[in-house]
Curated annotation (Swiss-Prot):
Organism of this sequence: Rhizobium etli (strain ATCC 51251 / DSM 11541 / JCM 21823 / NBRC 15573 / CFN 42)
Superkingdom: Bacteria
Self-association and partners: The basal body constitutes a major portion of the flagellar organelle and consists of four rings (L,P,S, and M) mounted on a central rod.
Stored HAMAP family: FlgI
Any one Gene Ontology molecular-function term assigned to this protein's record: structural molecule activity
Family (UniProt): Belongs to the FlgI family.
Location in the cell: Periplasm; Bacterial flagellum basal body
Lineage: Bacteria, Pseudomonadati, Pseudomonadota, Alphaproteobacteria, Hyphomicrobiales
GO cellular component, one term: outer membrane-bounded periplasmic space
Record protein name field: Flagellar P-ring protein
Length: 373
């Protein structure tokens, strides 16, 4: 817990240091780092394939009959007869293969693919994905994938115990897909460029439009950009401009960024991320916990000798309850540093901090958006 508080405090100090320096040095970024081109979005690809070469960790044909059907169909396509009994070798696994086709990708380029088990395979480590076609939402084949599978997790199994670390039923094939079909692109024929902010914000959108208009006025003699809303900035193509060169110049312009105050909480992992612009109104916080411990200690009762009795188990339950009262802390926080210091003074665990932040938000004292994941 001490390590957690040290990390939170360190993040708070760094964030507040940046906030204190804001008047002299504002956070700036290139437009390419905070926005993307609407015409340059990714497209998702999907396919069904087989992974072979597994060391007894593949699908069982009885529980996953589709794996055997797929294997027989593949062998028949290769001209190999599949007449005979059922194989018991668990060295094949059926998988779903997914990939993202980047914008403007040309035939011959390579993609990373992700494979995920469909059947009861226990591990894909050491396997090889055989030739698998990847299709888009329109049903057209855009890439073909094949290669060795890399799995980050591991599994060790004995007769009486199994140890698993990470996920062994999913993996990646780096550069395993080759693009065979090019997506239709009308970028050169476009009359404007539409930039989409990755973190929508009206202030940032206006600043992007102003920076682009300053560049366009000096280069083309007039403004060309307009902020449509908090997410989109539309740039009209000047008559004498080439869109590719225009985009190359625009994406390298420097703009001052701004983000709304947010507190992001992941209740499953206990992760708390507090933005540097978070403000807290004066509020009093008290935190106490009730711990209930239930212990089962079954007692074995043996019968008397030669009594023809039976051994019985008598349940015995011990219940202990302990309630710890928390101190009351007055959090008068104009900044993030005061908020973190106030929570540390109470001495609560991460799950307690999550509950406190939710309570502060309900009381109307947290001047930020609370995001629960």
């Amino acid at each position: 817990m001490k390590l957690f508080f040290r990390i939170v405090t360190l993040v708070a100090v760094v964030a507040m240091s940046l906030a204190d320096m804001a008047p002299a040095w504002a956070l700036t970024s290139r437009i390419k780092d905070i926005a993307s081109l609407q015409a340059g979005r990714d497209n998702q690809l999907i396919g069904y394939g087989l992974i072979v070469g597994l060391q007894g960790t593949g699908d069982g044909f009885r529980s996953s009959p589709f794996t055997e059907q797929s294997m027989r169909a593949m062998l028949q396509n290769l001209g190999i007869s599949t007449q005979g009994g059922q194989s018991n070798a668990k060295n094949t696994a059926a998988v779903m293969v997914t990939a993202n086709l980047p914008p403007f990708a040309s035939p011959g380029s390579r993609l990373d693919v992700t494979v995920s088990s469909l059947g009861d395979a226990t591990s894909l480590r050491g396997g090889t994905l055989v030739m698998t076609s990847l299709s888009g939402a329109d049903g057209q084949i855009y890439a073909v994938a094949q290669g060795s599978v890399i799995v980050s997790g591991f599994q060790a199994q004995g007769q009486a115990a199994t140890v698993t670390e990470g996920v062994t039923t999913a993996g990646r094939v780096p550069g395993g897909a080759i693009i065979e079909r090019e997506l239709p692109s009308h970028f050169k024929d476009s009359v404007n460029l539409v930039l989409q902010l990755r973190n929508p914000d009206f202030s940032t959108a206006i600043r992007i439009a102003d920076i682009v208009n300053g560049y366009a006025s000096a280069r083309f003699g007039g403004p060309v950009a307009e902020a449509k809303d908090s997410q989109e900035v539309v740039i009209q193509k000047p008559r004498t401009a080439d869109l590719t060169r225009l985009m190359a110049d625009v994406e390298n312009l420097i703009v001052e960024t701004d983000t709304p105050a947010k507190v992001v909480i992941n209740e499953r992992t206990g992760t708390i991320v507090i933005g540097s612009d978070v403000r807290v109104s004066p509020v009093a916080v008290s935190y106490g916990t009730l711990t209930v411990q239930v212990t089962e200690t079954p007692q074995i009762i043996q019968p008397e000798p030669f009594s023809r009795g039976r051994t019985a188990v008598q349940p015995q339950t011990d219940i202990a309850a302990e309630q710890t009262g928390g101190r009351v802390a007055i959090i008068d926080g104009p900044d993030l540093r005061t908020l973190v210091a106030g929570l540390n003074n109470i001495g609560v665990k991460p799950d307690g901090i999550i509950a406190i932040l939710q309570g502060i938000k309900s009381a109307g004292a947290l001047q930020a958006e609370l995001v629960l994941q």
